[in-house]
Amino acid sequence: MDHLSYSQFSTYTKCPRSWYLGKLRQAEEKQTWYIPIGSAVHDMIEAYLLGRPLEPAGGISAEQFFYPLIEKQMLIEPDLTKWLAGGPETAPVTHEKALQRAVDCFEKAVEELEAIDVWEVEYDASGRLPGLSVPIKAFIDIIGEHKTKGPVIWDWKTGSTKPDNFQLQT
């Protein structure tokens, strides 16, 4: 292993067996709807911050970011009914609802960004920690200053799970 990411460390601390199977044995993960939602939103925000215009001006559209991720996952598991979904069991977030969730999360992020002077996008904070034999690979989504709250370090999250402070403490 040439490096360790925060998410790998987090997986290991929660479930060492899951980390072992996924990272060392390269076991195939079950496909999900929430991974392409989060990835599409993250990529759309990055494109927005790098100056791409929003739709309908021929710019950022959720479909352009979301559907290629779905197609890639379908190469692994083409049966969408086997994919894990978020939301309530009676109304799971799949298909069009998943795309709409990506749109909603992106629009909320753009709204929140209006109050932030962005200094860095995808800042490379990789390095070494004492006692760890492999380097830590770390990219910070946003570094900037909120107009009323001061300096911010932001990690985009599209789900209900909020990041813990270990990311910033390292």
Describe each region flagged by the PLM.
Residues D2, Q8-T11, P56, Q73, ...:
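Alpha-helical interaction segments
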Residues W33, I37, A98, A102, ...:
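Hydrophobic (often cysteine-bearing) scaffold residues that line and stabilize catalytic clefts
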